[in-house]
């Protein structure tokens, strides 16, 4: 069975929400509704702080360098403003798996590590980063990656 990998609600996170927005509904205010759902969910986690929403428009994800808001989000990560990215699905970020793999590895290698949580797939990149038996070779460091200990020293992982 597939393990669910989620960020630990007891950890302090500065969150950037990435949305690829393409309204296919009859509702004009769908984006506001979508943002409210994220705000309501984050409000349930007192140690989580919403930094900003990063919204790129379009039905499909471009390559990362073409997504202005994704680039702004990555810059905020590198500047220490965001340490957890939450987005609906992998396909929102990039259509190129190698590009996403490199990006998630670079983020996980930061000090402190920066994770990405993909809601639809229920994948949290730092869970596999810290726990060897959860490792997915498409997204995460290879077996020789030994910078951090195998145990979860900071309580960043919640496995349900």
Language-model regions: role of each:
Residues 1-160:
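Short, structured surface patches at the beginning of a domain
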């Amino acid at each position: 069975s597939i393990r669910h990998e989620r960020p630990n609600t007891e950890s302090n996170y500065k969150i950037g929400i990435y949305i690829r927005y393409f309204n296919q509904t009859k509702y004009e205010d769908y984006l506001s509704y979508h943002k409210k759902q994220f705000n309501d969910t984050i409000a349930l986690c007192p140690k989580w702080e919403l930094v900003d929403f990063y919204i790129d428009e379009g039905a499909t994800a471009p390559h990362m360098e073409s997504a202005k808001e994704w680039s702004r989000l990555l810059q905020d990560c590198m500047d220490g403003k965001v340490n957890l990215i939450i987005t609906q699905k992998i396909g929102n970020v990039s259509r190129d798996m190698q590009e996403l793999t490199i990006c998630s590895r670079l983020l996980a290698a930061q000090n402190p590590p920066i994770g990405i949580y993909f809601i639809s797939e229920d994948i949290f990149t730092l869970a596999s980063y810290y726990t060897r038996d959860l490792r997915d070779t498409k997204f995460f460091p290879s077996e020789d990656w030994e910078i951090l200990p195998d145990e979860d020293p900071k309580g960043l992982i919640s496995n349900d």
